[in-house]
Curated annotation (Swiss-Prot):
Catalysed reactions listed for this entry: Endonucleolytic cleavage of RNA, removing 5'-extranucleotides from tRNA precursor
Any one cellular-component term (Gene Ontology): ribonuclease P complex
Lineage of the species this protein comes from: Bacteria, Bacillati, Bacillota, Bacilli, Lactobacillales
Gene: rnpA
Function recorded in the entry: RNaseP catalyzes the removal of the 5'-leader sequence from pre-tRNA to produce the mature 5'-terminus. It can also cleave other RNA substrates such as 4.5S RNA. The protein component plays an auxiliary but essential role in vivo by binding to the 5'-leader sequence and broadening the substrate specificity of the ribozyme.
Keywords, ordered alphabetically: Endonuclease, Hydrolase, Nuclease, RNA-binding, tRNA processing
Species of provenance: Leuconostoc citreum (strain KM20)
Oligomer and partners: Consists of a catalytic RNA component (M1 or rnpB) and a protein subunit.
Gene Ontology biological process terms, A to Z: tRNA 5'-leader removal
Protein's name according to its UniProt entry: Ribonuclease P protein component
């Protein structure tokens, strides 16, 4: 995923936190805000130390990024997403993580497709 598609600055994270709409399931919390002036969506990730050691957290981040990248064409372009991983996601498979990402994005009414 290109760096222009990522939320990196703490100020940008705070904007999403403060003006957010949120949805959660057992594995993820998703905060999102609409940004009509944007040309593409942006993604911010947060994986706490409760998820596991550093290599576990990086593994989870990679799986989330890959899942979002596969859904890129079905996401609106004018949105900032902040995905927070809960500890239950630590030892799950890539397929399961993608299913849960799809589930939480549908709950948030963000995903445009019915099923993938």
């Amino acid at each position: 995923m290109r760096k222009t598609f990522r939320i990196k600055k703490p100020a940008d994270f705070q904007i999403v936190f403060n003006k957010h709409q949120s949805v959660a399931n057992k594995y993820f919390i998703v905060y999102h805000i609409d940004k009509p002036e944007q040309k593409h969506f942006r993604l911010g990730l947060s994986v706490s130390k409760k998820v596991g050691k550093a290599h576990d957290r990086v593994w989870v981040k990679r799986r989330i990024r890959q899942s979002i990248l596969e859904l890129k064409s079905d996401l609106p372009h004018d949105i900032d997403l902040l995905v927070i991983a809960r500890p239950a996601v630590a030892k799950q498979s890539q397929k399961f993580i993608k299913e849960q990402i799809i589930h939480v994005l549908k709950l948030a009414d963000i995903l445009k497709v019915e099923d993938k």
